[in-house]
Amino acid sequence: NPFSFGTFARGYNLNQQEEIGEYYATLGRREGYAAQMAYLGLKAGLINPKTLSADNTEYDLSGDNLERLQTYKIERSGYVNKYNFNFASQIGDFIYLGMNLNAHNINEKALYSVKEDNFRSSNPYLRYANHKQYINTTGEGFSLQLGSIIKVTDELRLGVSYQSPTWYKMKEESRQVLYATTGVATRTYDRDIELVNRYGDPIWYEREYKFRTPSAWTASAAYLIK
């Protein structure tokens, strides 16, 4: 059940007056990602406080945890570019050298969506829920390859090559939206929870990180049959 926010909600205090987006950021720094998800569920009506007292930290699920329709969707678009700069040299008639310098460029946009509807109960309080997470990733990287072939005899060739790691520097921007519909009898209420600042602008959360891929050595041999 991807909307079992009751698991995450223990310990969240109902008494807060900040903007949704700003409080979401503060909650993440203090309590972590699980608490942020519980907060979105609370604002959308997926979980409800057991009491309305300021010090309440106990919540109940709005969903019935019975049969429902779940839809998962992932959309990705973007590109990965690689630019090569090649160099070659020869020493005498028996040593051949080569080098590639590579520049990498990444730009990807992704949408992760989880939707639930068609709840089994005849008159459920929670009618519809759709959590969306947008992630934009950009980055640059560098790598190189070195290689050499040695002509041992007219028939025998020995080779060795080195593939360096690809060193990446990445930047990731993300934002979340939670849409929900709740209702009693024939009356329904739409709750669209978007993370915005006090001026109404969407809030994107940024993080930067570095990583590298493994390196590799390769050896080879060839014998020419005349």
Language-model segment annotations:
Residues 1-226:
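Outer-membrane beta-barrel porins/channels
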